[in-house]
């Protein structure tokens, strides 16, 4: 009888180890895609993430500008902000932006009165893509910003006095303009605390 109890005890311990090991393994796998998405060339330039169109849309705006010098009315651009999916999943779980989090700002021209469209406006042609990246190992400021235009394969970080200083001063959380991203606000597990 004692041998049977002992065997059941070993089986329970083995089951606990297998289940906890699976949990630990899933945690490691869940965090690894962030690092795998960020690639630099031999000159230290960020390589353009080719899969950015598959990222999670977290916010959009029309004509949102940060100064009085923006383009004239009627020439306003659409801005679509997308977040790399594994970074979004991490944010949903923790309310934090993990290292290697990337956002893409896709800037499109405004179209109107074409084909069957008689009123309103729509997203037309891609004008530029910019990437925000959290990489404290590489950038002392934590976040860096990159301009890729419409097809540049790699980009150096934009000078800190540009995008970084504005995001640092006005970003609602960790250099991120959450005030403009309703999907992030809704996904934030720390909201209301």
Question: What kind of region is each of these model predictions?
Answer:
Residues 1-12:
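N-terminal Sec-pathway targeting helices
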Residues 77-88:
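Short, structured beta-strand/loop micro-motifs enriched in basic residues and often containing a Trp
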Residues 10-20:
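Hydrophobic membrane-insertion alpha-helices, especially the h-region
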Residues 32, 38-41, 48-56, 60, ...:
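Sequence context surrounding c-type heme c attachment/ligation sites in exported
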Residues 22-31:
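Signal peptide processing junction and immediate N-terminal pro/mature segment
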């Amino acid at each position: 009888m004692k041998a049977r109890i002992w065997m059941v005890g070993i089986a329970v311990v083995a089951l606990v180890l297998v289940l906890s090991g699976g949990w630990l393994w899933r945690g490691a796998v869940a965090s690894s895609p962030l690092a795998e998405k960020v690639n630099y060339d031999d000159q230290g330039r960020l390589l353009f993430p080719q899969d950015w169109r598959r990222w999670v849309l977290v916010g959009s705006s029309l004509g949102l500008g940060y100064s009085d010098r923006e383009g004239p009315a009627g020439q306003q651009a659409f801005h679509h902000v997308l977040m790399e999916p594994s970074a979004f999943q991490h944010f949903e779980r923790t309310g934090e932006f993990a290292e290697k989090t990337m956002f893409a700002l896709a800037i499109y021209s405004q179209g109107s009165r074409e084909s069957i469209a008689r009123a309103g406006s729509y997203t037309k042609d891609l004008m530029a893509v910019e990437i925000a990246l959290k990489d404290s190992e590489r950038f002392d400021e934590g976040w860096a910003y990159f301009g890729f235009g419409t097809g540049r394969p790699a980009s150096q970080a934009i000078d800190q006095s540009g995008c970084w200083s504005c995001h640092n001063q006005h970003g609602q959380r960790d250099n991120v303009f959450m005030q403009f991203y309703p999907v992030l606000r809704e996904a934030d597990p720390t909201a209301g605390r």
